[in-house]
Regions:
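Secretory targeting and sorting signals
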Residues: 1-27
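C-terminal/peripheral segments of proteins
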Residues: 28-691, 703, 716-892
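Large, well-folded core regions of big proteins
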Residues: 691-702, 708-709, 713-716
Length: 892
């Protein structure tokens, strides 16, 4: 499809004027179950409230008492871990709260009317705000007011992070996080204003309606700020405790916050330079042909055995991997130098320490961990679709997501949103439908190599002209505060922008100096996706799978969207995917001279032609759908930074269980779907998928008693499901010895299996793209998303069979392909692991005094406000916000 980068939208005028739907009379505000199809439950730990006054902060320091509704959903969330093995349908309500529209009169905790036409009602049990507006703008105002009530200080942190100004706001320890944001989403105020003023898709009329929503939302935030400055019971105590200044909000703050979350959860690709460095290292060691073949095995771009959400084929960027057309690989033997972002820092310690900015930066680096599972009506016990849905956004105190319910002309929705962009529910339910997402990580980011000219690293050649790069500067200054003792200092963040995007590094291509530039389709267009979220909240845009897909297609960030109502289910992969210049490589940098631009590229408006609607992976009423950030569909190439889509993925853990549940004509209940998710949430993928083949490979050589005893422990762990959990709550995992062996063995195993052939330098190069998946340097919960498990398995399968494995490597690594030599290699690596003590594996950070897996793996909540300190919860590899849904009736 040819058209602008941000596809055209055709929203009926009736939708824009919000007159197409009936809503309950304003006098009936809060009526329980009004316009509700029934069957909705959810949980969002730790709790709804994020407001802590100075007095509450001091009370917590004195006696550890939380403000009300700060942590009352955590017991539900944690409790499912222990109930999961024997979960029944009647127990689901014990672990997911009622998410029905409205509040029963007997359950109303508070009613606030911040202005005429706006009513906000909260329930006694969990304090979730229900916002009712007489007009659409009243509803948006209420959303802003309620959001500020629950997350004002966090919203301030987020807008400053989005603007790369967090160091100036909260201290110099945040400077690295600011530099990361500035390198990825550097915007001037003019840029942010333009995002809402001059949309690249749809009519100006519909964007006027959207802009009115944003402005009313900001008005609501500012109304709360104004009131809080007069009423200390509404003012977050962090402002006083940290000496931070509270300023009014602007619409540009909403755009800056959107750029932050879009950059963390809604992008994929952009690692072309790293990939190029790896292929160069392999070429140097094995020669060009063999080196590239080995690179392809690790790359796993389109492994034929990779699990997918939909079975159909949706071909995208499969060809031309090593095309020489415009190819800009760094010259062999040369280095690529990262661009310097931080300049003029007056204190080295400003780069140290932990901060909220660091936490969000880590989410960007860690990858994505959401999952959802949907069963079609013909496969469920109640004859209606069943869904367990949720995004994983990490764990924070207070949570970086918040829940709200919105009602007004044309709007009925409840669910989770990111504070600061919460004018709409982003993940949740409507009248008689629910939707959710996982990060897809599909390729919407490329790298162009700008050929430098004019004897300067800040000039580049484009379409025959030598152009100046645009210099973008963010000045920073900070003082020490109660949370960050970094000495006072100042610095400048500097990036350079070309027509393609932001400069990330410098290198040499064919002897010419180049600047490598990140080109992201959503850059300068963060606002474009708002249209899709707006539609999700409007029942007349979400009545059918077709309408849902059209709504989801307006979201330019890369997400796997799931939908279900009382009859149907659907899936759609959203995202703005560029049509690359014909014949160019989608895997490596290409020259930015203008000849190899994206098709239809308009440098002035930063638009181009996009992949058409029907070309995106999608399906309707598929019997079973699972997404755990896995590959969307066959022949949909993994993004250049995604090397983990091998012959199995963690989504198999859930899908295998559900396939067994519905096999032979059987049907699944809601509890069984919840159980499949939760049982998988504590499994170690290595135990479930790799160890059985490892044991088989080790049998080619006799085992001594020490090895045999270790293997016996591991086998018993595998037979029990390979879980990392403590069901009896004694503080020690079941099969703890086996888990300790596995964690100590894994890095030694991979080193022994691959390093003799690859060499240490090449192994480290590959690990810069995809790490082993072993125990990390600091206590952390394992996600089992990306690691070397499929590499190890496919290599061992080749050794055992003596035959190439489809999608695998061109050579055998373990023991050079000899069964006995491989077995000895594996056994020797296991022996070496048995000499490692738990203290050597886990005795760091928070686990110095408790060096064991159950300590190391805990879900540790990062603090985003001052009332509390870091908390640790039992490990679950599970979504943060989660819905359990089976819609009871169709209201259409």
């Amino acid at each position: 499809m040819t058209g602008p980068l941000w596809r055209r939208i055709a929203i009926p005028a009736a939708t824009l004027t919000a007159l197409s739907l009936s809503v309950p009379a304003f006098a009936d505000t809060g009526s329980y179950g009004t316009n509700d199809g029934g069957g909705f439950r959810n949980v969002l730990p730790p709790g709804q409230n994020g407001l802590d006054t100075l007095g509450q902060i001091l009370a917590f320091r004195a006696n550890g008492s939380f403000p009300k509704h700060w942590a009352d959903q955590q017991p539900l969330y944690d409790g499912l871990l222990y109930a999961s093995p024997t979960l029944t349908d009647s127990q689901v309500k014990d672990y997911y709260k009622d998410a029905t529209f409205g509040v029963k009169k007997s359950n109303r905790e508070s009613t606030v009317k911040p202005r005429k036409g706006v009513t906000i009602i909260r329930d006694k049990k969990f304090g979730v705000p229900r916002v009712y507006g007489k007009t659409r703008q009243d509803t948006m105002f209420g959303a802003g007011y309620a959001s500020a009530n629950d997350r004002l200080f966090l919203m301030d942190v987020l807008r400053h992070t989005g603007r790369a100004e967090l160091a100036s706001f909260l201290g110099g320890a945040n400077l690295n996080a600011d530099a990361n944001q500035w390198s990825f989403a550097a915007y001037t105020d003019k840029d942010l204003k333009k995002m809402l003023k001059a949309p690249a898709q749809g009519s100006q009329k519909e964007w006027n309606a959207l802009r009115d929503d944003v402005e009313s939302y900001v008005d609501g935030i500012n109304a709360y700020i104004k009131k809080a400055k007069k009423d200390g019971s509404l003012m977050p105590g962090e402002y006083t405790a940290l000496g931070a200044t509270l300023k009014p909000w602007k619409t540009t703050d909403v755009m800056a916050t959107a750029s932050l979350f879009g950059g963390i959860f809604g992008r994929g690709g952009g690692a072309e330079v790293t990939s190029a460095q790896i292929v160069r290292a392999l070429e140097a060691r094995f020669g060009v042909d063999q080196g590239r073949a080995i690179w392809s095995g690790f790359r796993a771009k389109n492994d034929p055995a990779a699990p997918t959400t939909v079975p159909g084929s949706f071909p995208y960027q499969l060809k031309n991997t090593f095309s020489t057309k415009g190819l800009a690989l760094p010259d062999q033997g040369t280095t690529v130098t990262p661009a310097t972002i931080i300049k003029g820092s007056t204190t080295a310690s400003s780069l140290q320490g932990q901060s909220m900015g660091d936490a969000l930066l880590q989410e960007r680096l860690d990858g994505h961990h959401s999952n959802w599972e949907v069963i079609a009506a013909n496969k469920s016990t109640n004859g209606r679709p069943v869904g367990v849905l949720g995004p994983q956004v990490g764990y924070y105190l207070p949570q970086v997501l918040m829940e709200l319910e919105l009602h007004g002309p044309g709007i009925d929705a409840r669910g989770a949103s990111f504070p600061g962009v919460s004018m709409y529910v982003q993940l949740g339910r409507g009248r008689d439908y629910a939707w959710s997402a996982t990060s897809a990580g599909s390729d919407n980011v490329d790298t162009f190599a700008e050929v430098l000219c004019g004897g300067s690293k800040y000039k580049y050649r484009y379409k025959g002209k030598c152009l100046d790069m645009e210099k973008l500067v963010r000045k920073q200054s900070w003082k020490p505060n109660a949370a960050d003792p970094t000495p006072a200092g100042k610095a400048k963040l500097v990036v350079y922008r070309t027509v393609h995007g932001l400069v990330n590094s410098y290198g040499t291509v064919n002897g010419k100096k180049v600047a490598y530039v990140t080109a992201r389709t959503t850059y300068l267009h963060e606002a474009d996706s708002i249209v899709g979220f707006m539609r999700f909240n409007q029942p007349d845009q979400m009545q059918t799978p077709k309408q849902f897909k059209k709504s989801a297609s307006k979201i330019q960030f890369t997400f796997n969207w799931a939908y279900l109502n009382a009859k149907d289910t659907a899936y759609y992969l959203s995202g703005a995917y560029p049509k690359r210049a014909k014949g160019t490589s989608p895997d490596f940098p290409v020259l930015g001279t203008g000849k190899y631009d994206w098709q239809g590229f308009d440098a002035k408006n930063y638009t181009s032609d996009l992949l058409g609607f029907s070309k995106h992976p999608n399906t309707t009423n598929q019997s079973l759908m699972v997404s755990w950030n896995n590959k969307p569909a066959k022949d949909w190439a993994a993004a250049d930074d995604q090397w983990g889509y091998g012959s199995f993925y963690r989504s198999d853990l859930i899908e295998d269980k559900l396939e067994a549940v519905i096999a032979d004509g059987k049907k699944a209940s809601l509890a069984q779907v919840v159980q499949a998710m939760e049982e998988s949430a504590t499994q170690d993928i290595r135990a479930a998928k790799v160890l059985p083949t490892l044991f088989a490979a080790m049998e080619a050589s006799p085992q001594d008693a020490q090895v045999a005893a270790a293997v016996d422990k591991l086998m018993k762990w595998v037979s029990a499901g390979g879980h990392r959990r403590d069901l009896d709550k004694d503080g020690v995992y079941e099969h703890n010895d086996a888990i300790e062996i596995m964690d100590a063995w894994w890095p030694k195993l991979l080193t022994a299996q691959f390093q003799p052939a690859l060499g240490e330098d090449v192994v480290n190069e590959i690990r810069s793209m995809i790490n082993f998946g072993a125990v990390t340097a600091n206590p952390s919960a394992p996600q089992f998303s990306d690691g070397w498990w499929t590499y190890s398995l496919q290599d061992l399968q080749r050794v055992l069979s003596g035959q190439p494995v489809p999608g695998g490597f061109p050579i055998a690594f373990c023991g050079n392909g000899e069964k006995v030599a491989c077995a000895v290699t594996l056994q020797d690596s296991l022996k070496a692991a048995l000499a490692v003590t738990p203290a050597q594996t886990y005795g760091f950070g928070a686990c110095v005094s408790d060096p064991q897996p159950s300590c190391w793996n805990k879900n540790r909540a990062r603090v985003t406000a001052g009332v509390t300190e870091p908390r640790a919860y039992p490990f679950q590899n599970r979504p943060t916000f989660q819905q359990a849904v089976s819609v009871e009736k169709d209201l259409k």
